[in-house]
Amino acid sequence: MARGKKTQETGSSKRRSKVQEEEEHVEGSEEEVEEPEQKSSKRGSRKTTNSTSNKKKSVKKVESDDDDEDDLSELDVVVEDDNPVETSDNDEVATTPQQEKSSRSRKNRGDHESHDDNSDNEEQGDRGNRREHKPRPKVDPNTPIGKLATDQILQFLQERGEESFNPQLKHGARQLLNQLLGKYNGQRYGSKRGGPPRGSFGQRGGFNSRGRGMPPRMRQGDTRDTRDTRDTRLRFNTTQSNRRELNDQSDDLYND
């Protein structure tokens, strides 16, 4: 019998525990339902506070706009006071200090631009004068040669070469005239710089048998006597037995 009582007691305790768990579950669900309600109420309160703050801001904006309008009206009055007024004494327009400053700045700009234009025109005029070549007066062919200077004689020869289509006379007289007047540039035997891109093709130009040629002293050729070379060739190409005869023949040739 004792065993049966224990089983009944355990069954009743299990039932009680289940009932307690269900009650706790129901209470937890109620709490969960209450939490979103509280959140929604908080959101509503926030919205109401935001709406009230927006209303306050709008009221402030309206007030600030009114203040700005008042300020603008004051500014308009000031500007109207600063507008130019025609005076009856001098019949001139009275300007404000700001307008005077702006007019001065405009005048200064105009003067500066006009000065620049004048300077540009002067530079162009100088360039034009530099490019202009004043021709020398022609020499009268009827004047005696004793009364002509050297440059006049050379100029006359140059003119005669142009008229007679003689380029040698024309260019020769012109070169002599330029040399006499100090306008002659001597012949240049090559430049010292390299080719178009630096370092390519070695050292092109200068005194290295390329470009405009070698200097004149290096182009003189062999200065030795050709007769000596001819004698040496004959001597080395023959035998010793015939040397005396060849020497006699060469002496006879030189004596002749």
UniProtKB/Swiss-Prot annotation:
The ranges of region (Disordered) come to: 1-171, 185-256
* Protein name as annotated: Uncharacterized protein R561
In which residue ranges is the amino acid composition biased (Acidic residues)?
Answer: 21-35, 64-92
Provide the alphabetized UniProt keywords: Coiled coil
Compositionally biased tracts (Basic and acidic residues): 108-129, 219-234
Q: Which ranges are annotated Gly residues under compositional bias?
A: 192-205
Transmembrane parts of this sequence = none
Per the record, the coiled-coil ranges are 14-39
- Organism of derivation: Acanthamoeba polyphaga mimivirus
